[in-house]
UniProtKB/Swiss-Prot annotation:
Gene3D superfamilies listed in its UniProt record: Hotdog Thioesterase (3.10.129.10)
UniProt keyword annotation of Cell membrane present: no
Lineage: Bacteria, Bacillati, Cyanobacteriota, Cyanophyceae, Synechococcales
Protein family (similarity comment): Belongs to the 4-hydroxybenzoyl-CoA thioesterase family. DHNA-CoA hydrolase subfamily.
EC number(s) reported in the record: 3.1.2.28
Top-level EC class as recorded in UniProt: hydrolase
Species for this entry: Synechococcus elongatus (strain ATCC 33912 / PCC 7942 / FACHB-805) (Anacystis nidulans R2)
Metabolic or biological pathway, per its Swiss-Prot or TrEMBL entry: Cofactor biosynthesis; phylloquinone biosynthesis; Quinol/quinone metabolism; 1,4-dihydroxy-2-naphthoate biosynthesis; 1,4-dihydroxy-2-naphthoate from chorismate: step 7/7
Record's protein name: 1,4-dihydroxy-2-naphthoyl-CoA hydrolase
HAMAP family, alphabetized: DHNA_CoA_hydrolase (MF_02101)
CDD domains according to UniProt: 4HBT
UniProt cross-references to SUPFAM superfamilies, sorted A to Z: Thioesterase/thiol ester dehydrase-isomerase
Amino acid sequence: MADYQFQRVIRFGDTDAAGVVYFAQLLSICHEAYEAAIAALGIELRSFFSDRGSVILPIVHAEIDYQRPTYCGDRLEIELQATALGRDRFRVDYRLSHNHQPVATAQTIHLCLESQTRQRSPLPERLQDWLQITAD
């Protein structure tokens, strides 16, 4: 399976009063990696994440497991893999590490809906292409 690689330095604003990354912030960083992977396909993010398009892709499930804390200044390496789950949804798996040591694993599941009716819809062709690329 082909991975998309993303790097992100932890900023002070990512941390909590204990000086470690706030637990929910790692999911936000995973979403940054997802956005970067979509942008790397040449997809314009403003229209992709807007309800003015023909479809929307809400996250219907998210989970994260933490292996070790991360701190301000740490450089995270994030690998993500996307997998189709039928014709109208897909899963993104994330592996986060720092200095080649596992930090966390996460997963999001996205559902494709018609933006106006909110009914299930097949994944757009460009997204299907991305899923095929990551499956190879």
